């Protein structure tokens, strides 16, 4: 199963943001343990680097951290088709629309995010890290 990790989940892991780090880190380990494929949209990478500047001051350390993390996930393309069709979703938050469009184009089974309300579509299932972990433990 391919699982798209939303930007907030990746930042939680890389910045070790409390109180979200523990569930997000456990989520990533569970995804690997169950042979699922963790995915990140190419468009999210710039957002991740930008947000992490608040948490990791040293530029080299920041970039190395992100580069190392990206070796662990599949990076999904964000194309002209993706960004154009994301407008048609009519989301309040365009970044979330792009994430959903990437998910649809790549046959993603679910999106893991802390902001489920931002993904008001039922096209691709969304879950919080905690809900995903509870489901996997059941």
Residues covered by each model-derived region:
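Structured helix-beta-strand junction loops
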Residues: 34-35, 72, 89, 122
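Active-site neighborhoods of divalent-metal-dependent phosphate/nucleic-acid chemistry enzymes
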Residues: 74-116
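Short, well-structured N-terminal submotif of metal-dependent ribonuclease cores
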Residues: 1-40, 54-60, 121, 133-138
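Acidic, PIN/NYN-like endoribonuclease modules and their adjacent C-terminal/linker elements
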Residues: 2, 72, 104-138
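General small-molecule cofactor/ligand-binding pocket signal
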Residues: 39, 76, 127
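A general alpha-helix detector
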Residues: 9, 47-51, 85
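Active-site-proximal, substrate-binding regions of enzyme catalytic domains
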Residues: 25, 47-74
């Amino acid at each position: 199963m391919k699982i798209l990790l939303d930007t907030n989940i990746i930042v939680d892991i890389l910045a070790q943001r409390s109180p979200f780090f523990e569930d997000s880190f456990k989520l990533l380990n569970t995804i690997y343990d169950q042979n699922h494929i963790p995915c990140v949209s190419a468009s999210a990478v710039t957002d991740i680097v930008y947000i992490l500047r608040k948490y990791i001051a040293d530029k080299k350390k920041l970039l190395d951290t992100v580069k190392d993390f990206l070796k662990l996930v599949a990076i999904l393309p964000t194309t002209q088709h993706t960004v154009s069709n994301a407008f048609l979703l009519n989301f309040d938050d365009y970044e979330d629309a792009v994430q959903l469009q990437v998910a649809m184009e790549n046959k993603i089974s679910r999106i893991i995010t802390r902001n489920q309300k931002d993904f008001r579509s039922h096209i691709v299932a969304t879950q919080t890290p905690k809900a995903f972990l509870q489901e996997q433990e059941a």
